[in-house]
Regions:
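N-proximal low-complexity "stem/linker" segments adjacent to membrane-targeting elements
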Residues: 236-237
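Catalytic-site signature of metal-activated, phosphate-bearing donor transferases
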Residues: 1-232
Length: 237
């Protein structure tokens, strides 16, 4: 029984690329828990940021009830192509909503979704997915590694509205956006301007360094600006 003012957390099983494999390693995607439910006390309110807010009012998460006999399977990483487009669109949103936010910090926030260092995968037990497949629910569906989705359209709309240079420092250029533009045209969209990667050599190296090592690029000016900002934040808190 969940008492009034309590929040429920459950194990969060991150499936990876296939419906019957999940992460089991030292990454944030392994052996994690999330809050999935709460019992309202009629006083708690959501005071979350625009992005990445909690599923429960923050004030209730201190009253945690851990449930381990139920586990939540997370399908985010089954359709990796769509997942990569989603991460790009989120970073576009960040750049639009917080134009003064440090781009090195934005990139670092989203880099962990690409972290496959020393990746370990375990087989999901049949009982967790076969009964659903037998009921006609296609949780075993496989997805192509190429293609086009609605999030690509939204990114291209932002390019068309604001220009690509606005987004030159955020880590979204692991996707070939000119190829996406050509696919969009075939679907009837009118994106007329060719898209050329606007990044400098330093920015390209920075993005590669971040993706490979999950570390800030120590040679970038924005990194030192971020350090100063964090220091000042600590001093004045």
């Amino acid at each position: 029984d969940v008492g009034i003012g309590n929040a429920v957390s459950m194990p969060w099983i991150n499936l990876w690329n296939k419906h019957n494999l999940y992460r089991k390693d030292k990454s944030v995607w392994s052996d994690s828990r999330q809050f999935f439910a709460f019992r309202d006390d009629r006083r708690a309110v959501f005071k979350n940021p625009v992005f990445h807010g909690s599923r429960c009012p923050e004030i209730l998460t201190k009253n945690e009830i851990k449930i381990d006999y139920l586990k939540v399977m997370h399908y985010q990483f089954l359709n990796l192509k769509m997942e990569r487009s989603k991460q790009a669109l989120y970073q576009i949103f960040e750049r639009n909503h917080y134009p003064n936010k440090n781009t090195e910090h934005i990139n670092k926030i989203y880099a962990h979704v690409f972290d496959e260092r020393s990746m370990g995968l375990c087989q999901l037990e049949d009982e967790h997915y076969i009964p659903w497949v037998e009921r006609g629910i296609e949780i075993d569906k496989e997805y192509p590694l190429d293609g086009y989705n609605w999030r690509d359209t939204e990114v291209l709309k932002n390019f068309q509205k604001f220009g690509v240079k606005r987004y030159k420092n955020i880590n979204i250029w692991y996707i070939d956006w000119e190829d996406k533009r050509k696919k969009a045209i075939k679907k009837g969209f009118n994106f007329t301007s060719a898209i050329v990667d606007p990044r400098s050599l330093s920015t390209k190296l920075s993005h590669k360094f971040l993706m490979k090592y999950q570390l800030y690029s120590f040679w970038r000016l924005d990194f030192y600006k971020l350090l100063i900002y964090k220091f000042m934040e600590t001093v004045y808190l």
